[in-house]
């Protein structure tokens, strides 16, 4: 029997090459929270990738504008919920800038140490999860083990592991515990050991390197054009770190380096984060060395700082102070302010407007993830479908921060 | 007009004004406890002390003091300006006064505040004044210190019942004597006084008397702290949960301006507070008026009824259609209500005279009652003058009783439940009543439709002096009640007529067009474009 296609040209055997449409997310385990990427595929190559955020929407800024200034702290915990301390400190600094308050030195060192712990937790989560999504489960467990050590310290200090709500206008909720310095000194070498162990396992792994190297690369100029900041920008070789460029707290008094990449690809982003963990360790060590063991942690500002609880129960003055601050909120002088700090993912900016009342008139948040996620489709288009997972993972998009 | 300078700002004043009053007229508050714009000034709280600059060439008023010098480690003789009470010193042309800008004045306020709180109990969590207390406000504005006294504070009587309405707490009292002066100067019944001196000082009621009469609530209203509380509001609500509407008291034809405080969560009115209006009630209200906020909830009609049996609005309107079938317009009477707003009355008036074509217009309302020459008016209706303006020909309800008796009127559409005369004879007529509150006319009604009270809708009321005042909506309508003007449009529709209004502003515009009644609720006219 003759084959049926005997007369046909070889070219005609091919299937029609119409692009295939595919939804990645919003409910997909690699879509970190809820992002949807509408893909147009030619074979396995992405012709077009339309990144859509907005599936996690809480009306975040509007919520902040309904309570008192102090009631915003629990909300900002839920921005980048892997490093809530950085968000707390960033918001506190913004309100303090509006009030013209400067917290005591002890509090500044404390805020730096806690913030850098949060940054370590943030970077460990990002790199660990990225490895896991590429099939490397063991390093993920090691990184999370190291993160648990960070969270143990934060729990000891704040009482909560994840959403601490620990910042206060003009200070912190509590002074450092007696064990704080000891806990940090004990945990930091162990954390770096675990990071190095994970590194040895991953960076000699051919499959891991091949899936990261030259994938999702972006030039420094493009990244700046997109408004990128943080580790993703530094991976392209642009050494912009707000802690160096516009120092706040005591960052100008400590020694640390700004790790940068060269190619701006996924591997660089992975490595920059690991580098920053080591720098954070240096900052924490210097901070706890220089932080006094006693002294005030809060500003001497009765108009924003809550009185001592025993005084509230026994004296009318403290009762009035407590009542006014809780029921009406601290009256923040009328005006507007933009204050920015280096968050886990880059420039975390707060634009606040006060009408002089106890409630924020406007809270606008510049979350670093928003701009970074905006560049995702540029990284993806032309790449293979399987490149989404490492590329997206390396951007460390956090749904809570992308709430717009 | 002469002027003086307060903190470098030039303020005009009327000759005879004290510094504090001149500032108050310009909306600037000099902190004070004992001064009240409606009362005399005893200058006893010392909170309003200001630094009056000497005239050029004059020696400044100064005090010799010993001040601790930390550097020298001893007390050194110094001089500081002698401060004077702003509530007692009359403003003079060209006078220069320092208040907020003077370090000495701020220091004095701080110290006065510390003295006033010296023996104050830790009562904020259980005090009704909390949230609107001057002690709290001024501590934050001028105090911001912590307690230095380590002794047990002086204890004084708490929960002293002054009379049927007022309870006194001597520990919270700052001895400003506003209540004493109110009773003596405004209520003309000097029943309150002080006894003892210093930290044992307290307010008492004259022996053999109680704090009673028609103006006792105002003693609580003038109290700048939580010393006087009313039995009515005590422990009922926390003020920061309350919202307020600018209302007009419905108790009598004076039409006192009031704040109606309500809780939007429970949709309940909680109290009245007088709203300052120099032309009507100045700063005051009477006890009956202060308690009349309760009428937003008490004695209300909340569902339609046919012959006393509750039913739906649709069935009630069907019944109206049935009982009005084939009735000649000449035998229908409409009864306006001096209790209801201009808008409600206008709707009924237009429906009755224009749509139905009836010429029988009557007016009802509450009976006259107690009156005095302070605030309380004989006429207990908020809008008698308004009804007069809409329908000058309206006949009193007494004549309707006669007309029904003589069978000249067989059907009645009435607004409001109250009646100034015994209306039992109206039972012979078929009556439709639209009312917010129970009364003789609601009991006689064949069909009864619920209306919203003044608290649940915006309405205009004309007081005895002929002043049109708008009372704002506070709470949401209770039950299935709706504004009477809406129900009247529905009654008109049931009888086959189309009302000319569907919105409140249409009624207001129509009253202006037809009767020339100025539209009080209309926003100011826009500036015409070039």
Predicted stretch roles:
Chain B
Residues 2-12, 16, 24, 52-57, ...:
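N-terminal export/assembly segments and adjacent metallocofactor-ligating motifs
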Residues 58-77:
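Intrinsically disordered, low-complexity Ser/Thr- and acidic-rich flexible linkers and loops
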Residues 326, 351, 355-361, 365-520:
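Non-catalytic alpha/beta scaffold blocks inside enzyme catalytic domains
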